[in-house]
């Protein structure tokens, strides 16, 4: 299973980017056209994209066959085996 890369996040709310001169000119121009400052322009346009990427990475897609199999197991769970029973009885009693 792939692990997600860990990104160090500083405690401040600043984000520094290096872009080409042409890219910066285009971004500044687009922000001006929308009559917004550079920060608001970048944040308002990147947040939906970032959310879409995170949602896609964290969502599980199942085939119809997989869905039916899971529903069948939930509706008719198998009997617990010896290892599961032993593990359950080894747990501390949480009743108080």
Curated annotation (Swiss-Prot):
Reported effect, residue 14 to A: Decreased autorepression by TacA3-TacT3
InterPro entries tied to this protein: Ribbon_hlx_hlx, TacA_1-like
Top-level taxon: Bacteria
Subunit structure: Forms a complex with cognate toxin TacT3. Forms a 4:2 antitoxin:toxin complex with cognate toxin TacT3. Forms a 4:4 antitoxin:toxin complex with promoter DNA, where 2 TacT3 dimers bridge 2 TacA3 dimers. Only TacA3 contacts promoter DNA.
Xref: PANTHER family: ABC-TYPE TRANSPORT SYSTEM (PTHR35401:SF2), COPG FAMILY HELIX-TURN-HELIX PROTEIN-RELATED-RELATED (PTHR35401)
Function: Antitoxin component of a type II toxin-antitoxin (TA) system. Counteracts the toxic effect of cognate toxin TacT3, but not TacT1 or TacT2. Plays a role in persister cell formation.
Protein name per its UniProtKB record: Antitoxin TacA3
Gene responsible for this protein: tacA3
């Amino acid at each position: 299973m792939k692990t997600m890369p860990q990104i160090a996040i500083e405690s401040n709310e600043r984000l520094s980017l290096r872009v080409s001169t042409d890219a910066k000119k285009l971004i500044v121009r687009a922000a001006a056209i929308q009559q917004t400052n550079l920060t608001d322009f970048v944040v308002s346009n990147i947040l939906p994209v970032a959310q879409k990427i995170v949602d896609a990475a964290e969502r599980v897609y199942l085939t119809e066959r997989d869905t039916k199999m899971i529903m069948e197991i939930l509706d008719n769970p198998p009997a617990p085996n010896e290892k599961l029973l032993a593990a359950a009885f080894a747990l501390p009693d949480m009743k108080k």
